[in-house]
Amino acid sequence: MLKTLKDKKLENCSSINNKSKKQKHIVVGLSGGVDSSLSAALLMEDGWKVEGLTLWLMKGEGSCCSEGLVDAAGLCEDLGIQHNILDSRVIFEREVIKKTTEGYESGYTPLPCSMCNKNVKFEEMLKFVIKQKEFTYIATGHYARVIKSSCEHINNSENFQFKDFLLLRGADRNKDQSYFLYSLSQEVLSRLILPLGDLKKEETRKEALRLGLRTAKKPESQDLCLVEHYGSMQKFIDNHVKTKNGEIKHINGKTLGTHNGIQHFTIGQRKGLGIAWPEPLYVESLDKQKNIVYVANKNDLLKREAIIKEVNWVSIEAPIKEIEVEAQIRYRSEPVKGILVPLKSKDNLTKRFKLIFEDNQSSVTPGQAAVFYKGEILLGGGLISEFSKK
Ligand SMILES: Nc1ncnc2c1ncn2[C@@H]1O[C@H](COP(=O)(O)OP(=O)(O)OP(=O)(O)O)[C@@H](O)[C@H]1O
């Protein structure tokens, strides 16, 4: 197995070294792309007993569909391993397509990859391995890391109550996919091996070439399989969400134009508004009830707080008092400092938190995930449900 960890101390903590591996059974989620192919090949090289599993997510061409299934099958043939295919089209339709559509209808900007990881990919893989006769691990080609919290090199100056397994950012910050994994449970983490967590994307390609994998030169897939499938998110929306004309208003109340459905807009959007105004205007909020798109100057987009719902604590027990975090509010955005305050609920098991930013933030977008980190450790995350003004 390649050793590329920058921090050699953490290397000894990595789950791949902690979980005794020789001849242990592992099921690798294969999408037909280079990342999951290399994951399977590296695990084999490392002595694991590997099987492939491809979830059939949608009808059609492309990596999520028939092309992905065929590529994954070919890879398994090359590697001489069993290939399993699960028809997950119904659950994908219900949990991703329908919920993404409902999100847009409600004026949110949904995050289909998180929905898929939460309710389809890892659910289905876990169910599959639990049914196996012997204890079976799970692997995917995500760029993130899982380590044991008992690792002595973990800094816990905040006195967090760590759970047994911690989820960490991928070592390659440009490829880090931990943001999409905030909904994982300890049950999944205890079985999960992420063989690419310590690699850079260039290293993945090099390794795939070294091992002669048929997917070594396959182009990078889109971040979003729905984009790859439909051509663009706009086309997905046109296909699924009904058009309902409404008004575009300045937050000062002045009507500036009309729109053909709030689903076509996202917070922070500047282009394509089709309105004339002396200074640049941006989408500030979407009012589903009144079917209004509100626009404002850049400064008016700045928010002080957001309410985060359905929070899942991945690596720590749910905090009962406020904690300081680094919050990432979009996949590609830099983490920002903030304070998380638990909001009371009747059962005392709050899943709602108020996130107060140290500096006001633009692009706080309901429907996107807010993921909380402390350095490399992903503490937990949830969905931005609303924001309050500056
Ligand atoms: N249809 C699927 N069936 C099983 N596992 C999947 C499927 N799609 C994705 N995965 C797993 O999830 C990981 C991350 O998926 P993502 O869609 O982000 O692909 P990716 O980063 O482009 O990886 P790849 O190069 O393997 O396609 C994949 O590496 C793979 O292990």
From Swiss-Prot:
InterPro entries: MnmA-like (IPR004506), MnmA-like_C (IPR046885), MnmA-like_central (IPR046884), MnmA-like_central_sf (IPR023382), Rossmann-like_a/b/a_fold (IPR014729)
Reaction catalysis annotation: S-sulfanyl-L-cysteinyl-[protein] + uridine(34) in tRNA + AH2 + ATP = 2-thiouridine(34) in tRNA + L-cysteinyl-[protein] + A + AMP + diphosphate + H(+)
One Pfam family named in its UniProt record: tRNA_Me_trans_M
Residues covered by region (Interaction with tRNA): 175-177, 330-331
Signal peptide boundaries: none
Enzyme class, first EC level, given as a word: transferase
UniProt GO molecular function: ATP binding; tRNA binding; tRNA-uridine 2-sulfurtransferase activity
Binding annotation for ATP: 29-36, 55, 141
Major localization listed first in the record, in broad terms: cytoplasm
EC number from the UniProt entry: 2.8.1.13
Example of a GO biological process term: tRNA wobble position uridine thiolation
UniProt keyword terms in alphabetical order: ATP-binding, Cytoplasm, Disulfide bond, Nucleotide-binding, RNA-binding, Transferase, tRNA processing, tRNA-binding
GO cellular component: cytoplasm
Source organism, top-level taxon: Bacteria
Disulfide bonds, paired cysteine numbers: 116-225
Active site: residue positions: 116, 225
Subcellular location: Cytoplasm
PANTHER family (UniProt xref): MITOCHONDRIAL TRNA-SPECIFIC 2-THIOURIDYLASE 1, TRNA 5-METHYLAMINOMETHYL-2-THIOURIDYLATE -METHYLTRANSFERASE
Role, per record: Catalyzes the 2-thiolation of uridine at the wobble position (U34) of tRNA, leading to the formation of s(2)U34.
Family statement drawn from the similarity comment of this UniProt entry: Belongs to the MnmA/TRMU family.
Protein name: tRNA-specific 2-thiouridylase MnmA
Lineage: Bacteria, Bacillati, Cyanobacteriota, Cyanophyceae, Synechococcales
Gene that specifies this protein: mnmA
